[in-house]
Amino acid sequence: MQLMTKKLANVVETLIAPSDKIRKILEGYQVSCPVEVIPSGIHLEKYQLCKKEDWRKKIRMQLGISQDALVLVYVGRMAKEKNIEELLEYQQDAGKSGVILVLVGDGPYLPELKKKVEELKLAKNVIFTGMITPEEVGRYYQAGDLFVSASISETQGMTYAEALAGGIPLLCRRDGCLEQVVTDGENGWQYDKKEDYLMRIQEWKGMGENARGRMQNKAAISAEKF
């Protein structure tokens, strides 16, 4: 891969990377041309509209979740490299205070994750939605107060941008692809260990309605760079 990239760089004027993480990787290959970062675009309106239409209430009713519950939502492929097991392990502590984790999507690792939920006795505060249609994706983000991810395998992570566009702040494991995405305390947080993760959840719980609204607005504004 490195050799092919270097050869390609010799015949082009510029390489385009979707994130700063990939730019650094390419520059580590010692390519001969400049590397510019241009994020893959998304249709912001699709996710903004779901917020305006108040899908939060509708999806929560559909999933049997209280409107007052603190909900963490993950949207994406259920695959081992997404490190979803970490979210389940952390949910053992987060769930003690009534926090609900909603895992949206399907994938080859789903049976293992369901088995993990049984082993950890988390059935009361972890919900699997299974596969949903593309039209429903933006609606399911709205079920959450915070979008969570433990993945460190992303090149850009379009779900981060989608969540932000819907006004959902992020709580994600620290990763290079998030350097230009998350501003701690503004549109979400990055975490390094379980204690950080749980602390941020408690911080959100302790916020007033106005403070939460400001972070949600900043999340939506920050998505415009995509």
Regions found by a protein language model. Name each.
Residues 152:
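Aromatic "clamp/platform" in nucleotide-sugar-dependent glycosyltransferases that forms part
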Residues 1-15:
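Membrane-proximal helix-turn-helix segments that form the acceptor-binding/catalytic region
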Residues 195, 210-226:
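A charged, aromatic-enriched C-terminal amphipathic alpha-helix characteristic of glycosyltransferases
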Residues 169-172, 182:
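Short hydrophobic beta-strand element within catalytic cores of glycosyltransferases
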Residues 70-93, 108-114:
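A conserved mid-protein helix/loop that constitutes part of the nucleotide-sugar donor-binding site
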Residues 131-132, 139-144:
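Short alpha-helical donor nucleotide-sugar binding micro-motif in glycosyltransferases
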Residues 21, 41:
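Carbohydrate-associated surface elements
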Residues 184-185, 189-195, 203-209:
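Conserved acidic donor-binding segment of nucleotide-sugar-dependent glycosyltransferases
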